[in-house]
Amino acid sequence: MKTIKLSKHDKYVLELKNKIKDNYDSISLNVPVKYSKRSLGEIDLIAKKGNRFDLYEVKCSYRILKAKKQLDRIKKYLNLKNARSYFYCGNSKLLVVV
């Protein structure tokens, strides 16, 4: 049986999921976001607890400005103004509120 080799980014996404999984009712990974026929991108991790959504963007290196821009754009199009946004740097294992 052939094993699938995960990318560094995918390993970091799974690492973050394992860190936060006990705090949420459900977690979705690599969620594509589309508007009409146009792709707006992908959210690395969406976590739900009750009626509250938290969005997580994972980067291999510390590129917080790019992550914030992506999260803000997704929140705008999904009308999730009250959702909390987080950035996770896999290299430094740092989780930051953005």
Q: What do these predicted ranges mean?
A:
Residues 1-98:
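Intrinsically disordered, low-complexity Ser/Thr/Pro/Gly-rich regulatory segments
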